[in-house]
From Swiss-Prot:
Assembly, per entry: V-ATPase is a heteromultimeric enzyme made up of two complexes: the ATP-hydrolytic V1 complex and the proton translocation V0 complex. The V1 complex consists of three catalytic AB heterodimers that form a heterohexamer, three peripheral stalks each consisting of EG heterodimers, one central rotor including subunits D and F, and the regulatory subunits C and H. The proton translocation complex V0 consists of the proton transport subunit a, a ring of proteolipid subunits c9c'', rotary subunit d, subunits e and f, and the accessory subunits vah-19/Ac45 and vah-20/PRR.
Gene, per the UniProt record: vha-14
Provenance organism: Caenorhabditis elegans
Keyword NAD on entry: no
Official protein name in the record: V-type proton ATPase subunit D
InterPro entries named in the record: V_ATPase_D
Length: 257
């Protein structure tokens, strides 16, 4: 039997092994197709997140610039109120909660900023500069929400990048390693089975030829040895000896009348 130098799975060539390899090949091809679709979906989401990151970073610069101007205006009209805010801080009003979004089997973290309870500084700037302080709070709240959204996008970007790399490695492994190995194994099994069938056919023909030759030799040997004693007795019973006198008397000419 041929050994085969190609990379293949070590199996004994049989019909059962051929069926199992066909099943494994079908499963590998289906898995390859599903992983390709998963990689395409992840790449689509990855590009969408990348576009949003670029847009949010541009928007973030404008929002932070507007918030900085609002802070300068509020300090100009209401004076330095930072010590008042620091003294009255008990807990953060804006909190961040996290949830997970499933994208074709990859869980992406999503951060959400929300205000916990009523605004404790609603009356800040009531004496002077109230409008500027209100605008300041609004701008910084917008900046916080945008920062949280940007953090979500960047975290999803990193997670998707790693998931895409892993998926592509799996796709390449199935396409260039697993499927060729199974195909080489199937080729080896089919070749070995065909060779075994040819060997079996040749062996059967050889056995038949030997039997025929043996029969011919036995027949020739019997012909050389002649009939046996049993065969002579049977021949005598079937063909009794002739009466030569009786036959000769019948054929004698009549000499006397």
């Amino acid at each position: 039997m041929s050994g085969g130098g190609k990379d293949r799975i070590a199996v004994f060539p049989s019909r059962m092994a051929q069926t199992l390899m066909k099943t494994r090949l079908k499963g590998a091809q289906k898995g390859h197709s599903l992983l390709k679709k998963k990689a395409d979906a992840l790449n689509l989401r990855f590009r969408d997140i990348l576009r949003k990151i670029v847009e949010n970073k541009v928007l973030m610069g404008e929002v932070m610039k507007e918030a900085a101007f609002s802070l300068a205006e509020a300090k100009f009209t209401a004076g330095d109120f930072s010590h008042t805010v620091i003294q009255n801080v008990s807990q953060a009003q804006y909190r961040v909660r996290m949830k997970k979004e499933n994208v074709v089997g990859v869980f992406l973290p999503v951060f959400d900023a929300y205000q916990d309870g009523p605004d404790a500084y609603d009356l800040t700037g009531l004496g002077k500069g109230g409008a500027n302080i209100a605008r300041l709070k609004k701008n910084y709240n917008k900046a916080i929400e945008l920062l949280v959204e940007l953090a979500t996008l960047q975290t999803c970007f990193i997670t998707l990048d790693e998931a895409i790399k892993v998926t592509n490695r799996r796709v390449n492994a199935i396409e260039h390693v697993i499927i060729p190995r199974i195909e080489n194994t199937l080729t080896y099994i089919v070749t070995e089975l065909d060779e075994m069938e040819r060997e079996e056919f040749f062996r059967m023909k050889k056995i038949q030829a030997n039997k025929k030759k043996l029969k011919e030799q036995e027949a020739a040997q019997k012909a050389l040895e002649g009939p046996g004693p049993g065969e002579d007795a049977a021949h005598s019973e079937n063909n009794p000896p002739r009466n030569l006198l009786a036959s000769e008397e019948d054929n004698l000419p009549v000499l006397f009348n």
